[in-house]
Amino acid sequence: MSNPHSSAVIVLAAGAGTRMKSAKQKTLHSIGGRSLLAHSLHAAAGLSPQRIVAVIGHRREQVRPEVEAVAATVDCEISVAIQEQQNGTGHAVQCAMHELEGFEGTVVVTNGDVPLLRSETLRSLVDAHTAVPTAVTVLTMSLSDPTGYGRIVRNDEGEVTAIVEQKDGDEETLKITEVNSGVFAFDAAILRSSLGKLDSNNAQGELYLTDVLSIARTEGHPVRAYRAHDHRELAGVNDRVQLAQAGKILNQRLVEDAMRNGATIVDPDTTWIDSEVTIGRDVIIHPSTQLLGKTSIADNCVIGPDTTLTNMVIDEDAHVIRTHGFDSRIGAHANIGPFTYIRPGTVVGENGKLGGFVEAKNAQIGRGSKVPHLTYIGDATVGEESNIGASSVFVNYDGVNKHHTTIGSHVRTGSDTMFIAPVTVGDGAYSGAGTVIKEDVPAGALVVSGGKQRNIEGWVEKNRPGTPAADAARQAHAHETKEG
């Protein structure tokens, strides 16, 4: 037998997955912020194997970039084997073994559509396989309804003698509730030898990987099973219903992990957390919150309710309420929301504020600066301790190009100020309400752009006679005359 202390992993991801009814290859559908295939590859990488081989075939032009993207993030080599025609799992492993020429050790075979399988379970399988000399160890599970799964057939001593697929089983065999998960640990030398002896004499007319067990046993090699503790880990995803079910189980796992690590999640059923999100201690997450991508929440933050954060960095003690944010950073002790939209490239400094109905895009807000109400701030830099008045607009687009606005420190702008970029407002400057700033404002200046107010008496009664406004004006004038 081979050296049991080295390992390689084969991940099968060549199938068509027609039940998904999708233009996307099955294993590229996502739960928890990762594709099904990425989950499987990361679980495999957790074994620290010498190599991972992903077997791809159907729509491989879609799948190969995903394999390459995962390979760039893990500490082991991942290569690709092509299965030109999908002729069964045995044929898929034959294709993969060309990438493992000369390898001697344990070969783990798993699938690209089992996103809930943990590295720890794979490690337990390998440990069980290598504890004593074994040709094959199959990872099994017990199901109350085993329909569709290959049944584990044992002899009187409890040894595995065969795996019988659903379509090939007789009535007695189909009563067995212990089933094949599709995950195996093989001795590399015995696997290589047995693959050459497979035939397609079965209901599907394919090469079954499971027949390797019968071949190995016939040749006198031991075949064993290791039963998984949680059958949900081994649930395959074949359609959209199963995709949603797996996503819910994964999210429950991630939410519970966050709570066990010191976060308070007020309503776990309405909180969704992606696999690469990090959450600190004493964070409070209110209902209907989604933390997506590589979002990072530092200690003592309050997030939600009704908040979606994607690839956001939230520093300690920040409060983010009813906000949608993407690819940005919120500083320590900052206050965001409610109803705030944060677009990529925005940085809010320590003690900063983006208030109700504020949209920020590619904006750097300095320490202690506030944008409290009803404002669009795009392509802008704001210094420290400045205040942007309500209903202000940073007019950054001329129809062709985007332009930058620079606001200094300790600036106070009146409500309804328009900043026509490119423009700079110096430190300590003020603007009057309704000002349209088209030119640079010196430090310490007060800028106003409106002319003297004119009141045209009687205009409404003269130009809008018979309207409610004219009637109200006439009554007001009559009241003034009576009191006068």
Swiss-Prot record:
Keyword Nucleotide-binding carried by entry: no
Cofactor binding note from Swiss-Prot or TrEMBL: Binds 1 Mg(2+) ion per subunit.
Class of enzymatic activity (EC top level): transferase
Keyword Cytoplasm: yes
A single BP term in Gene Ontology: regulation of cell shape
Reactions this protein catalyses: alpha-D-glucosamine 1-phosphate + acetyl-CoA = N-acetyl-alpha-D-glucosamine 1-phosphate + CoA + H(+); N-acetyl-alpha-D-glucosamine 1-phosphate + UTP + H(+) = UDP-N-acetyl-alpha-D-glucosamine + diphosphate
Binding site for acetyl-CoA: A390, N396, Y397, S415, A433
Binding-site positions, UDP-N-acetyl-alpha-D-glucosamine: 12-15, 26, 83, 88-89, 150, 165, 180, 238, 343, 361, 376, 387
Positions of region (Pyrophosphorylase): 1-240
SUPFAM superfamilies: Nucleotide-diphospho-sugar transferases, Trimeric LpxA-like enzymes
One MF term in the entry's GO annotations: UDP-N-acetylglucosamine diphosphorylase activity
Function summary: Catalyzes the last two sequential reactions in the de novo biosynthetic pathway for UDP-N-acetylglucosamine (UDP-GlcNAc). The C-terminal domain catalyzes the transfer of acetyl group from acetyl coenzyme A to glucosamine-1-phosphate (GlcN-1-P) to produce N-acetylglucosamine-1-phosphate (GlcNAc-1-P), which is converted into UDP-GlcNAc by the transfer of uridine 5-monophosphate (from uridine 5-triphosphate), a reaction catalyzed by the N-terminal domain.
Name of the protein this chain belongs to: Bifunctional protein GlmU
Organism: Corynebacterium diphtheriae (strain ATCC 700971 / NCTC 13129 / Biotype gravis)
